[in-house]
């Protein structure tokens, strides 16, 4: 009986020991800080002018640091200044034309047209009376058929001129048609749009830095004739600084957006940078060869983007880093 109790006790002790070891191992695996490997993300942008022209000057060179809004270069703006002046003149002309149509006709202009109607009425009366005389003479064979036809043609032309003058007077008395005013308004809107485009083109003769960075390459020199979008500078963006790292599926649950991490470099192994996870890729991929990791290259991993919150000039793009998550 005692022997049986001893065996049962031994089994219980062994079972408890196994459970204790398993729990200890589980806690070790979950409490240990997660270590990942990656690189400072390389982000570059090609800068160029949106408009074509002759390069007048460049303000920075390779290796220079730049800040947002800094002037990097200028094109010869002469052609664009001329285009702007022409666009401004077109707008002024369209504004004057619209104002003239809206104001209608002046009394002096109406009086002038009335006088024109009276003159053409007199001319028609004379031509009509002359035709009647010629018709009487034709009946008595005193004029030729050609003379009669010339008189009829002159009377018809005088009648057409009189009708044109009367139509013009009617238009002057009723004012401009709404369609004419609408057309003038549309013409003004078009010239204003052309003016806005001319102003934008002139602004684009100055190349401004879009964000902070470092000039990597200077592709052209002053005097070069550039087409729109030709690369002038290649710039490495330095703000914000991102780290690209990779996490296995087994540890994916620890890589939560917003989680704080520490980032170590070989240059300062005892003084980490601090960052937060900003993005976790929804799709898996094989570990890139550029990442220094002890994991198998055939393992599927998920890409992380870590935003460094206290970056300095020592953190260079492409630099290998070690990312550590704090113990839970």
Curated annotation (Swiss-Prot):
Residues 80-109, 141-209 form a coiled coil. The keyword Nucleotide-binding does not apply. Keywords: Coiled coil, Periplasm, Signal. It is found in: Periplasm. Residues 1-22 form the signal peptide. InterPro entries: CusB_D23, UPF0194_membrane_YbhG, UPF0194_transport. GO terms for cellular component: periplasmic space. Belongs to the UPF0194 family. This is UPF0194 membrane protein YpsIP31758_2812. It comes from Yersinia pseudotuberculosis serotype O:1b (strain IP 31758).
